[in-house]
Structures are given as C-alpha cells and as structure tokens.
Amino acid sequence: MFKLFTARKHDNIWDFDGGIHPPEMKLQSSRVPMRIATLPEQLIVPLQQHLGPEGELRVSTGERVLKGQPLTVGRGRTVPVHAPTSGVITAIAPHTTAHPSGLAELCVHITPDGEDRWREQQPWADYSLRDKTALLERIHQAGIAGLGGAGFPTASKLQGGLNSVTTLIINAAECEPYITADDRLMQEHASEVVLGTQILMYLLQPQQVLIGIEDNKPEAIAALQHALRGQDEIQLRVIPTKYPSGGAKQLTKILTGKEVPFGKHSSSIGVLMQNVGTVVAIKRAIIDDEPLIERVVTLTGDALSKPGNFWARIGTPVLHLLKLAGFTPQNQPMVIMGGPLMGFTLSSLDVPIVKISNCILAPTEAEMGLSEPEQSCIRCGLCVDACPAGLLPQQLYWFSRGEEHEKARNHNLFDCIECGACAYVCPSNIPLVQYYRQEKAEIRTLDQEAERAAQAKARFEAKQARLEREKIARELRHKQAAVKLTDVDQQTVEAAVSRLARETNNTDSTISVTLGQPPDNSAVIAAREARKAQARARQVEKKLAAAEPETDAIDPRQAAVAAAIARVKAKKAAQAQLESEPVKSESEAPEEDPRKAAVAAAIARVKAKKAAQAQLESEPVKSESEAPEEDPRKAAVAAAIARVKAKKAAQAQLESEPVKSESEAPEEDPRKAAVAAAIARVKAKKAAQSASAVNPD
C-alpha cells in the first residue's frame, strides 16, 4: 500500500500562479517532416552567440577552413564557434546580428566551396570509458550553449552542478505559440534525446530524472515513450498546456513543487534543467564528435507557403531560409525572430541564424491584426494576475518610465522572464516587455560603468599609494645621503672635539711669549676650529635625529644613560688626542725671530702712550686752585681706572691692528708720548698729595 502511495506521489503535478492560454498555432509546422536547408552563397558566423565574452579569433581572411573547424578559442566561459561548412574566409567584419537592438557585431564571412568536407573526427562510442573532466571539456570545445533561448554555456552549467544536483529536468514543454522545433526533434530523434539524457545522468549522478512535456504534443509523447522502454530511471511527465510552463522556474514548480527564490536559479534548490535541443547537441558532441554547427529552426506564419522545420547551419541568412519556405513579402513585411510573445522584429533579413534562434515567424497583416496605439495605464491589475513570476508589472512599468533604476531593481525586475503574458492581457496595449528590456539594458550599462569607475578608482588609488611610497623612500634616501659622513669628515670632527677638550682643560694656563718671538696663537685658533667642529657635529646630530623615525617608545632613563656614555667616550677621545699630540716646551720658542718680537713690543708701548695722551686731551685739565676742591680719593680712583682703560685700549688696539714693521715705528712723535707720560705722572702725584693732605696720620 505504501509503495502505491509513493508511486502516486511521484506522478503529482503542481501548478504555478499566473499564466495565460493564447492560441497555439502549432499545426502549421508540426505535421510536416523536418527538411535540411541548402547552403547559402555566404555564411555569416557571429563570434558571440552565448552569454559571456566572445572568443579570440584563430583564423584570418583568405584562409581555407573545414567543416567543424574552430574559428575562435574557447577558454573559461567563452564558448568557441565553428565553421558550418568547408570553404574560404572572405571577410572578418561587423554585421547586423539577431538582437533587438539591430547593432552590428564582429562576424566571420565564409564562402562555401560546395564540398562540405569535415575536419578529422574522433567519435567516442562508449562515453562511460571517459572521465567526467574529458566529457565536460569535449562539450565545451564543441561550442554547446543552451538552445532553449538563454544561451548559457552548457559545460559551465554542468560543472557547477556536479556535486549539488539532485533532480535533472529535461525541458520539452515548448509552450510558446507557433514554435514546434522541439516537437519535431522529439518525434524524429527521440533515441538521441534519451542517449543525451543518459550522458547527463553519467555526469551529474542525480537522484531523479524527469522529462516534462505539454499534453498538446501527442506524437512526441508517443515517440519518447517508445524510446524510454526499459529506462525506468527516466520519468516522462505530461503536463497541462499553459503558457509559460516552459520557463525554468515554472517547470520546476510544476514537476517538483519547489519554488525558486527571488534572485536565484533552479540550481539553488538542487535542480538542473536542459533543453531537448541541447541534450541532442550533447549526444552528437560526445558520441559523434560533431560541434554545434546546425540546429532545428521553425519557419511558420501565413506569409510562408511551405512552413515547417529545417536543419539550418549556423550563420545562414534569414532571407535564405524564408525563400526555402516560400516567403511571399507583403506591402510592409514583418519578420519576427522567436515567438509572437517573446520574439522581436528583425530590422534586416540578412541577419544570420545563431545558436539560440529557434523560430522565424512571417505573419501577414491580417494574422497579426492592426497595431493599436498605446494608451495610459488604467491600473486594472490584469498584468499582476497574469505574471507567472509573481511580480508587479504595473509598478515595474512606472519605475521603467521614470528611470527609477534602484526601485525597479528592488522590485525584482531581473526575475522577469520576459514571457509577454502581461503585455498580452493589457487592455491599454502597453508593450510592457519592451519597457522591461530597455530598463534591464540601462541598469546593466550603469552597473558596467560603475564597475569600470570602481576599477579606475582602485587603479588610481594604487598608483597614488605607490607614488607616495616612492616619494617617502626617495626622501629617506636623500636624508641618509645628506647625513652620511665620510671617514675623513669623521676624523676631522674627532680631532676638533679633542682640541676643544684640550683647550677646556688648559683654560687656566697663560700664553707664554718669549722675547724676540711672535705670540703663540695656536690655542686661540684651535679653540675657534673646535667650536666650528662642535657646531658641525651638532648639525650632523640634528640631521640624524630628523632622518630617523620618531617614536614614543624610548625609555628616558635609557636615553640619559646613553648620553652619559657618549660624554665619557668624548672625554676619553679628547684626552687620547691630547696625549697623542706633544706639547711644545719653552725651549722651542727661541726658534722664532727675536726682531719681530721686539718690534711688536715697541709698537705696543707706543700705542699705550697714544691712548693715554688721547685720554688726557679728552678731559679738561683743572688748575691748581681747583685741585683742593676735589676729593683726592676719587681722583686716585679715577686715575687708576684711566690707567686700566688705557692699558685695555692699547691691548685691544694691538690685537685688532696688524703688526707694523720696524720702518713704520719711528714715524710716531716721541715728544708727544713724553708729554703725555709727564702729564700722567703729574696727575698721579697731585692725586697722591691730595690724598695725604686729607688723611693725615
């Protein structure tokens, strides 16, 4: 009983909110067998046909290529593209591609040679003999991307789900009106669908494998049931027809009952989904070594006399396929790539088929109906009821029109699957999906600009930091070079410090002058040099202190100890210098010229007399009658002070003026000197007499 209940539970089908039931319009092409499209005169292969960056070119203009030969290099999430047939590359230039913007992208133009000659192939009949890494690499190098419309690199998707997938879902719903590519593929290649599913099971090791298909495809259901005989691990689930049940989140909810959170993918709940066409491409890449160079494309619409499904090479122009289907242009032809709800109108019929092109719709004016003008939103709420993603289309519309990008992002704009259900039910004929696509593109552009700005800012800040480090290092080198002393400079400083210490020790000693010899000024000169050397040493210490980084972690007691040690070392060095230089004795003095010493002494005496005379003339001479009125003690003191000043002035004059030769000495008047000396003696005698008269014994 429990087993029956469990089996019944496995067959449960859930439903999702929203959705619509538009006319299916599938019988125009689903009852016609698939045809192989002929090669056009020129194939135009865009380099980017998937999500992610385009690959690096590995061919050049004028080069001959073989069928299946890679045209670009595939690294990481970059999927390579391949030559759809053998021929010559006539150009590598921009061309309009299958995109709503109608912008030109870089494409490889190949002129077929008609031979359709393959490159060397290496089929793997038994994939179970290969490890998973080799299988994933082969899928990647085959250029396989999601053929259901997203274009996500299949190998990257499988790599991310190797250890986290519990449920593998094969999407065979194909819910959009007019499109029957997967329907015819399952009818005619059901065995390849099953074999590709088994390869995925070998890679992912899922606990459950489900194939979801709508109940409006009875022929495909019968073909799959026949191919799945004996494959109990693969379960075929037939679901009700409802648009958009083929969406990844919607089909996950229908088959498992699990809802994918906002902003997440099905892989976040352990579910991995692959399209039927992608599964067949995986089988052909692994077993047959055929890269993705062709796919099934539905050509339908009342403007075609022979609608159906075609195996079309990647790069085939749309106009070439339309001609094969009997295209009859209207007055204002409209060709849509994709379905009527999720497709877009082509700006040019020279646009090539790419990996995600599943349908080309060529309707007549009557079929599409008259285009009604867009009107104001009446806030009816029908779009909210129809949205299968649980969004608020009305609010997203206002945010998109008002360019309120952050509000649109916060209202989960990127969870919109662009199914068109909201626009289908809108009574105001508002093209809501177009607004959402434009808003998404603007947000992506702003994000890219912000990312580039952040990268530029990071580079600028890194450059500024590097320049600052280089500046600090350069200044430090300059400071170190400025304070670096050579050996000679160090010796000079030490010698000057030693002389200064020697002079300090001999401050009480007098300078001896030997008669007939010039005075020894070496001590004065040495002191002056020592002071200069000491000043230079202080400057050096200041520079060294400035060059070293400041720190507050130095102990003041340690600093005091270091200073004391430095003073002791300096005193020892000065004493050693003093002991190393012998002091000259007085016996060495007679080596100087005695005549020069005599001349210097005579000049000193003459200058002293002149100074005394000048002092006498500057003060008025008092008469003898006035003398008794003065205080003799003050006069004696004044005379003594005058003599001292005269002696100091004479000594200063002697030091400041150069020593004159013998020939210059007789030029002074000896009589004036004698008069001055006599006057000085008279004043002294008067002062003495006055002092004795005032103070008798």
Curated annotation (Swiss-Prot):
Top-level EC class as recorded in UniProt: translocase
Bias-annotated ranges (Low complexity): 597-615, 635-653
Ligand binding ([4Fe-4S] cluster 2): C387, C416, C419, C422
4Fe-4S ferredoxin-type domain mapped to chain residues: 366-397, 407-436
EC number: 7.-.-.-
Predominant localisation class: membrane
Gene3D superfamilies for the chain: 3.30.70.20, NADH-ubiquinone oxidoreductase 51kDa subunit
Pfam families in alphabetical order: Complex1_51K, Fer4_7, RnfC_N, SLBB
GO cellular component: plasma membrane
Biased composition range(s): Basic and acidic residues: 581-596, 619-634, 657-672
PROSITE patterns: 4FE4S_FER_1, 4FE4S_FER_2
Subcellular location: Cell inner membrane
Note describing how the cofactor binds: Binds 2 [4Fe-4S] clusters per subunit.
Region named Disordered: 576-674
GO molecular function: 4 iron, 4 sulfur cluster binding; electron transfer activity; metal ion binding
Record-listed [4Fe-4S] cluster 1 binding positions: C377, C380, C383, C426
Cofactor dependency: [4Fe-4S] cluster
Membrane topology type: Peripheral membrane protein
Keywords from the named record: 4Fe-4S, Cell inner membrane, Cell membrane, Electron transport, Iron, Iron-sulfur, Membrane, Metal-binding, Repeat, Translocase, Transport
NCBIfam families associated with the record: PRK05035.1 (NF003454), rnfC (TIGR01945)
Function, in words: Part of a membrane-bound complex that couples electron transfer with translocation of ions across the membrane.
Family, as annotated: Belongs to the 4Fe4S bacterial-type ferredoxin family. RnfC subfamily.
Quaternary data: The complex is composed of six subunits: RnfA, RnfB, RnfC, RnfD, RnfE and RnfG.
Protein name: Ion-translocating oxidoreductase complex subunit C
Species of the source: Yersinia enterocolitica serotype O:8 / biotype 1B (strain NCTC 13174 / 8081)
Gene that specifies this protein: rnfC
